[in-house]
């Protein structure tokens, strides 16, 4: 049993290493203006403008400018940009590349995607080498043991529970997505890190992978005839003119939900943290900073760590659920529908 489990983990690690490189530069979905975010020149201009007004404006207007500047700084941290700041040590201006109208520039979020992909490849390569040299009778320890527990959790509680028979062929993708989304979320909470999952282009690409895999699973399970028959909803031909558009639109609501859910949750958390921090600067009060800004920021930060894990789990679980629903046979679906009805 132990040897069989070890061989399965080895196989999963190999496939994961093959899937990860596809989760790289997704910036081509954005227009040049969107991907550039807040450029260095615009930030400098805002800073000069705010400095000029600060010496002239009355207290009320100065507070308004302070709020505006705080909003600019928050958006600078949230939006993608080709300027990677390492305050107070300086900044790195990343190259802008536009090919045939598509922006494939290297930005903060693209760098984060590369770093996350490298981490996933390195981690699973190390674990794979450990399993190659490990005796089947030897229990894994430390980090290897933790990763085996993670693999078993995704295998049993996510893939097998939501997909059912034949879940093994989708497990490498689910493991890769979970680790990828989790690391993207966590790196956004690290100093000088950027939250790639706070970029809707990234979440849209991840959701597109799930969408494509879901349609492939449906075609394999039901064939082209069964796949097209699903669009009619099993209704009378007279209702097809209504049901087919509804079912067709329904195909795209799932990836849209995945896209917005992950993007909104990760973006909102960072906005809340930065807003709480800037309250003390806007009001210019140390009392507010000590009594409210710092404690609430720490609380929200800890909550964001939990949300980082939760959103990675939810994205993976919903991906498995959509694959399971698409590949489920009619009798299995009817059985589930009957159980839900009762």
From Swiss-Prot:
It is a multi-pass membrane protein. SUPFAM superfamilies: F1F0 ATP synthase subunit A. The chain crosses the membrane at residues 11-31, 109-129, 170-190, 199-219, 238-258, 262-282, 287-307, 308-328. Keywords: ATP synthesis, Cell inner membrane, Cell membrane, CF(0), Hydrogen ion transport, Ion transport, Membrane, Transmembrane, Transmembrane helix, Transport. F-type ATPases have 2 components, CF(1) - the catalytic core - and CF(0) - the membrane proton channel. CF(1) has five subunits: alpha(3), beta(3), gamma(1), delta(1), epsilon(1). CF(0) has four main subunits: a, b, b' and c. It is found in: Cell inner membrane. GO terms for molecular function: proton-transporting ATP synthase activity, rotational mechanism. Belongs to the ATPase A chain family. GO terms for cellular component: plasma membrane; proton-transporting ATP synthase complex. Pfam families: ATP-synt_A. Its main location: membrane. The lineage of its organism: Bacteria, Pseudomonadati, Chlorobiota, Chlorobiia, Chlorobiales. The keyword Transmembrane applies. PROSITE patterns: ATPASE_A. CDD domains: ATP-synt_Fo_a_6 (cd00310). InterPro entries: ATP_synth_F0_asu, ATP_synth_F0_asu_AS, ATP_synth_F0_asu_bact/mt, F0_ATP_A_sf. This is ATP synthase subunit a. Key component of the proton channel; it plays a direct role in the translocation of protons across the membrane.
């Amino acid at each position: 049993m132990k040897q069989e489990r070890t061989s399965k983990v080895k196989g999963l690690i190999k496939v994961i290493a093959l899937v990860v490189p596809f989760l790289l530069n997704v910036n081509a979905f954005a227009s040049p203006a969107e991907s550039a975010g807040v450029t260095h020149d615009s930030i400098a201009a805002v800073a000069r403008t705010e400095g000029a007004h600060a010496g002239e404006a009355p207290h009320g207007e100065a507070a308004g400018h302070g709020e505006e500047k705080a909003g600019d700084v928050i958006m600078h941290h949230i939006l993608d940009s080709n300027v990677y700041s390492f305050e107070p040590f300086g900044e790195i201006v990343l190259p802008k590349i536009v090919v045939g109208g598509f922006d494939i520039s290297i930005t903060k979020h693209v760098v984060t995607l590369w770093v996350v992909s490298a981490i996933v490849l390195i981690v699973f390569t190390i674990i794979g080498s450990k399993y190659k040299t490990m005796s089947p009778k030897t229990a894994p320890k430390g980090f290897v043991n933790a990763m085996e527990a993670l693999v078993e959790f995704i295998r049993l509680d996510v893939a097998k529970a939501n997909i059912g028979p034949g879940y093994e062929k989708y497990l490498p993708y689910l493991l890769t997505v979970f680790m990828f989304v989790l690391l993207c979320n966590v790196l956004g909470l690290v100093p000088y890190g950027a939250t790639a999952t706070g970029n809707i282009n990234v979440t849209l690409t991840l959701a597109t992978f799930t969408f494509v895999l879901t349609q492939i699973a449906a075609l394999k399970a039901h064939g082209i005839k069964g796949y097209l028959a699903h669009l009619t909803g099993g209704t009378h031909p007279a209702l097809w003119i209504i049901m087919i558009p509804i079912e067709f639109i329904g195909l795209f609501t799932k990836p849209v939900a995945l896209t917005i859910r992950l993007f909104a949750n990760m973006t909102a958390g960072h906005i809340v943290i930065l807003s709480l921090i800037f309250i003390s600067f806007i009001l210019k009060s140390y009392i507010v900073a000590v009594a409210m800004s710092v404690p609430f920021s720490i609380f929200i930060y800890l909550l964001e760590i939990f949300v980082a894990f939760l959103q990675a789990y939810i994205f993976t679980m919903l991906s498995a659920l959509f694959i399971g629903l698409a590949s489920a046979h009619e009798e299995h679906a009817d059985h589930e529908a009957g159980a839900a009805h009762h």
